[in-house]
């Protein structure tokens, strides 16, 4: 009986000494999720306004002239696959012409509209294509510091995958904000936000 009484007193004493203070910060709870930049903007307009001017704030945008740092003054030639690439603006649309020439004649031609620009332009602008929500990297990048139009990193030396480099969730969340990703897919998105 004394053991039970002692055990009961121990439990009561121990529970009374616990620190049950609640935190003033709501974001430490496990059910709190990412709310996005526009939610923050409602209370922190000054921080939002300065952030969107940083490299991270300009990290991912739709492919429009005003978001591009690229100069498309020459074409790219892949000497291994024998493809020529010429990006250019058609009005506000960024398109990539991919073609092959044999005996001074065009034997293959594909025109693809570019949907997104990834990279702030501080170092590079790379380019993303959306095919019904499936995102892939286009085979050209503009290196702004050297003003060079060339293949993206990893596409050189015979590794040009053309339009087959999938933009997976890991790539997207590092270079952009949290997207609405289709679970079970490798590169399908329901919605892609614009910048971190």
Show which residues each predicted segment covers:
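Bacterial Sec-dependent N-terminal signal peptides
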Residues: 1-26
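Sequence context of c-type cytochrome heme-c attachment sites
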Residues: 19-38, 42-196
């Amino acid at each position: 009986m004394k053991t039970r009484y002692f055990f009961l007193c121990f439990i009561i004493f121990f529970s009374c000494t616990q620190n049950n203070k609640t935190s003033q910060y709501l974001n430490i709870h496990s059910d709190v999720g990412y709310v996005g930049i526009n939610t923050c903007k409602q209370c922190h307009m000054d921080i939002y306004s300065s952030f969107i001017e940083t490299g991270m704030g300009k990290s991912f945008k739709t492919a429009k002239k005003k978001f591009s740092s690229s100069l498309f003054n020459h074409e790219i030639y892949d000497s291994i696959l024998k493809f020529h690439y010429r990006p250019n603006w058609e009005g506000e649309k960024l398109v990539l012409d991919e073609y092959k020439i044999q005996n001074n004649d065009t034997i293959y031609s594909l025109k693809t509209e570019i949907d997104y620009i990834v990279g702030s332009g501080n170092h590079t602008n790379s380019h993303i294509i959306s095919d019904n929500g499936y995102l892939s990297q286009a085979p050209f990048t503009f290196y702004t510091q050297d003003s060079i139009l060339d293949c993206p990193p990893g596409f050189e030396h015979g590794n040009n995958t053309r339009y087959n480099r999938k933009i997976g969730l890991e790539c997207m969340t590092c270079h952009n904000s949290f997207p609405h990703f289709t679970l079970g897919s490798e590169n399908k998105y329901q919605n892609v936000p614009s910048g971190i």
